[in-house]
Amino acid sequence: MHFKSYFIYTTIFNMAWGAPIPFPDTHSWMRNREREPSEIVKVPCSARAPPCKLTYELNGYFIENGLICYNRASVNYFETCYTGNYDYKLPLHPSFSKFGGHVYLSCDDAILQNVSLVGIQQTEYTSSPLLITNSNSEKISYSNLKTGFLGIVYAVETRACIQPDQAKKPEEIINHGVAIKPSCTDGVLYYINSACEVNVSDQTFSIPSCESVKLPTYDDTIEVCDKGGCQNVTCHPGEICDKYERMDMIMRIKNYQCSHIYRYSLYSIILFFVIVIVFTLITIMNILFFLKPAFWLLKKVLYSMVGLCHRRPVVDEVSVDMSTVRVVDEAEEGLLVVEDSIAPNTNVSDKVKRKGRKVENGLIFIPYVLMILLLVCSAESCQDLVSSISNIERCTNNSCDFISKMKLTLLNTPQDFCFKTSTDVYKIRFNSVRVMCLSVPLYYTNSFKRVISREEWKCFEGEGCRTDGTHSIWGESTSLSFDYCVTDFHIFSYCPAYHYNWKRIEYEPTSSRACTIMKCMDTKFEIVGYIQKNGHVLKELGGITSKYDSPLVSISLSNYNSARMPREYAECDGKAYLRTANDLGSFDKELLGNIQCPTKEDAVVLSSKCKTKILSNEDLPVIRYIERDGVDMLEHVKSEPLKDVLVSSSGISLSTLDLFPVELNLQFKEAITSIITSKISLNGTSCKITGIERKFKKTTVSIESSNKVYLSDILACEGLAVCPMILNNIKKGTCITTTYYSVTVGSMIKCKFIYSGDTLMCKYDVSPLEITVISPSLDVSSFEAVKTSTTNWMELLAGIVKDNPKLSLVASIIPIGLILKTIRSFLDDIRQVD
């Protein structure tokens, strides 16, 4: 909700409750990000933050649960950055009850904005708004604060108190609550008046109020922690009839005992389908009856339109014998004739006369009318991709013309960009975009292990006991090695007091395939598509290049999402990896560095031509061994290869959705008069969302239009991740996405196309993620039943003790009881035999 609508809401409330909340001018430091950005201040940023636990539509830095995190998404405005340490204990505004996922006050509040761009500056004791301006963005980029905080970041779920005077801190309510043991049913945690942390496997969720909260994800056992400690809680499945309202039709039929009105519901469904069939038949009959009159009316309208274009010939102005006239030119005024023709021209005057074109009727204009209609229809696939446009006057030798410069932003492909000049209609088709980073090798490296190959004791120092590798008592080695000396003092040594221990450390390769550290030197791109003029292909687009040139336009790459395309990377075995400060490992926990070899052959064997490079605060050129046994062995860095990145001999390239948004610079050689965009009618379009919530890529959004359409857009729905929706002259389309939080099943939620801005209501039929806990059935009535049981008794007893330590004594008695019962059964069998 925007601030203006919120102020109307609060004004109505305050007629009975009090004065409105005194907010400062929020447009300058707090902007809603659920609407189209009216103004963007781009912030160059090199900050680092852990990834966010939830996923949002925008790419950038977020305040989530009171902490700064980084969210990676396809929509990137490059407008967030921060420096310093954010302190969530300093509230940004005294009336905020919740900000950035952290609860400050407990009061009767209202939502201000779900996601907002906020400028914040903090000192050691206070927090205040920061104006979102270019100067402040530069200040954030170049500052390095040790204390305090500066930032322009996204904040989630901002709420404010309607009556700030009645607000209480959450601790005041929690301290007066009743402490009970937490319980969990169907993923809903109940823990009255208690702030807690919930651990589910390796995930941790901080929840301000655990009174009744649906967990983002859960397991059969979760851990709930508060001020009093942590305790394990079992998430029990609810009764089957409790889920009756969330069941689909088939499940309700199977569980008919849960509903007393099932029979009436079934009759209602049958009646509904009968009504639908009857109305469908009536609609079909109406179409059949009105189809022939509709065509007749269309014919009359076309004849009426072309009849207005009919022009009768003006033959009475001049009488010309065409056999005696030589035509020089046919201009707008008519036929030009001259006196000095080959013919005598005795019947023509000196001045130019007009001859009307004879047209029998207006039917000749019907093809032109149909062509105009086709042009309008073809524009339905066009989108407004323009970020900026300007017309520039260019003059040469006193003659001037205009050229148009334009910047386009692509969020997905395929896309069509259509425009008009003074004479023609053009369309540029973008089927796909690929960016390639042309790279050169910086050096070659390999993973290694340390081996002490030589060791010798000396009683005299000789030329000196060095630890920096500048002197050695041995000759040079053919492999990469390091010689150093350690001085030690022992009273009972064979040397007088001091002795000197010389060691040679050799670095042996642990891989037969060396890696190459590459650096991107130039960026080129490829567009697969074409340029069309008046329905005819003017130029095909394709091939890696730095610029596309055509008789109409030149296209170059301006910007792209480089998160998956690093400037420097490690190429190992045909795959690309992020380059870290230590490449393939570290020398010890505080000393980072790498081995650099001039050729790949040297890196395979780690020859003496390789060098060790160290990165530290002192910027030491070589390793200094201070501890007795030298450095620790290499700790390998476990990393995954860059996803969807293709490696070639020229460099790396990327063509997936991770590449977007892509910005292109276009320079036209003709002035553009207008941009043609599509306006797709969504009337009669149905939309349905199905799948399983909180499972990655397990939700499907399906739309069906009443007629065939061209559509390539980004669909954003409430509670769902954005997904690309593409329809190529078809009626139905689907896209796969992820549902992040629950919405009532069967309700209608609002979805929006990012390019066109059109909205669509979709029916939400996503099944909640449920778990079922099945307990084993145990039979201890006889020794035969115990012997044939598939139950692992040791695991069962260990689970009993783990879930409830108080039962450890009882669990230890169970085996003894089974043994006694078995002996008793055996004695009874003997008595029966006797």
Swiss-Prot record:
Top-rank taxon: Viruses
InterPro entries, alphabetized: Tenui_PVC2
Reported modifications of this chain: Specific enzymatic cleavages in vivo may yield mature proteins including glycoprotein G1 and glycoprotein G2.
Site (Cleavage): 381-382
Any further remark recorded for this protein: This putative envelope glycoprotein shares many similarities with bunyavirus glycoproteins. Still tenuivirus virion have never been observed as enveloped.
Protein name per Swiss-Prot or TrEMBL: Putative envelope glycoprotein
